[in-house]
């Protein structure tokens, strides 16, 4: 079993963006994937019908954050520590690129940005394989990530958006009292 956390993003109407559905597709391609979707703030209707096991809400991003995402990084680090997933997936967006890299650094995990393919079975072989552009996009290279969790950002459009529906359990991850590390 490969446990995966997909970090969701919202559009201007508050609904799940297409790249989140693409990340769910990528996660579901992993063998025996157990997928959780994490979203800041309350879960919108589009999240509560995703074909995943659970949707976890964390604190909303404060308007004073100004694109730094310290709170989201701290909250996700606490969730990753509690859940011990094999893979954490983000969209390669401003949010995903910043928080993914910060999360990897904070927890001492491997970071694979801008991936166009993901494979492997973290529970059996202990590795996740990713394919990503190198040399300014002139070539693709395959990498194996042997540490867990692997923090991955996925290139938008590299996967078809998942259109299946489900009825995931929706739960809240309480981070009140969480000690936040200074910048």
Indicate where each model-derived feature is located.
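N-terminal glycine-rich FAD/FM-binding segment characteristic of electron-transfer flavoproteins
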Residues: 1-183
